[in-house]
């Protein structure tokens, strides 16, 4: 299996502050409510909801909080008009950037995203301008500290249909096709595994490095995008040097 992880190398590495964690919970809560309202509040019959629950758990959201958001969706809360939108563009130094958002006002969100790109040495492009540089894959990350038997983890991952397996310094990374992601994740959950990340992502086919000046701009671009209330995920092909 793969010994090198592109995913691990292009994550924007930093400890989240309490305020940032609170914003992540707020965004996940909205996603839980919208998916529960649109497709039903029962995870057994709503596979999209199961996937969002798994993502929330991987971000350390307590189960009672998760269920609280789902229950709110069954009430009078208005989730009409929300839609998923993907933006593509270039960061400083020609870094390819994909932004996934959930919004009930696409004009507002597009304007805000464009402003963030412009302010940090990038530019928002047309749909399809960079997505061809990425592969859509399921990504499941497990901490080695909790499951030290690498052979067992790899055996189970492959048994449930994983496409690739990588052993990194302190984590295992399991890659799946988008179609098999839920099956692999649910199989591993039944085996007792817990995850620090579990979702479908855009993984770059190749990565680029930046000068220190452009790297500082890129960090600001990522921070500002992630801080936007409508943004769910930011993907890029910048490989940050250690």
Curated annotation (Swiss-Prot):
Coiled coil, from the record: none
Span list, region Disordered: 1-20
Cited NCBIfam families: PRK00110.1, PRK12378.1, YebC/PmpR family DNA-binding transcriptional regulator
Name of the protein: Probable transcriptional regulatory protein Csac_0964
Cellular component terms (Gene Ontology): cytosol
Keywords: Cytoplasm, DNA-binding, Transcription, Transcription regulation
Subcellular location: Cytoplasm
